[in-house]
């Protein structure tokens, strides 16, 4: 997914530019022609005033999953772990202890390998068999739709490099 072509980002730029549609269209045109754009100093200043950003790599993601599992008995997925970790960075830097709600939309079962490794378990299987291992270790119920995959045949096993995607898709459609 190319987040630079996100309608949410475009709406944010529109808001931060003082609803300057010509400026935002210029960014989108530049993105289309050059593959990137740089926003104005005014938009950068507005972003810095309203937002705080951080970074969470794989190691810190795993540590956060393990910490929340140990401290709260709650198994979080990798995406939620990044959000939690960056929130903790924000609190440490700013001292802001405002109550925070995380709306976690992913399941730890979507990332079994990473979650198992994070909680100190070596993944011992592959594919849907990992669902059982994570369930045995965590006690967290496997989501119904993922559990329904057990025993089903794999429909697709083709992988493609980015530069080959167009050809692979066209060949598949023949």
Predicted features, each with a name:
Residues 1-174:
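PLP-dependent amino-acid enzyme catalytic core
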């Amino acid at each position: 997914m190319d987040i630079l072509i996100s309608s949410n980002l475009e709406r944010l730029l529109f808001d931060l530019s003082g609803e300057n549609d010509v400026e935002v269209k210029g960014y989108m045109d530049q993105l289309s022609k050059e593959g990137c754009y740089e926003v104005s100093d005014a938009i950068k200043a507005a972003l810095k005033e309203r937002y705080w950003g951080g970074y969470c790599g794989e190691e810190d993601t795993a540590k956060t999953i393990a910490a929340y599992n140990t401290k709260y008995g709650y198994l979080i997925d990798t995406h939620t772990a990044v959000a939690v970790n960056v929130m903790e960075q924000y609190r440490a830097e700013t001292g802001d202890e405002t109550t925070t709600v995380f709306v976690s939309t992913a399941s730890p079962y979507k990332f079994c390998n990473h979650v198992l490794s994070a909680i100190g378990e070596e993944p011992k299987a592959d594919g849907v068999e990992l669902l059982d291992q994570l369930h045995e270790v965590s006690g967290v119920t496997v989501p119904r739709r993922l559990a329904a995959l057990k025993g089903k045949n794999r429909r697709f096993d083709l992988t493609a490099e980015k530069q080959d995607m167009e050809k692979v898709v066209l060949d598949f459609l023949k």
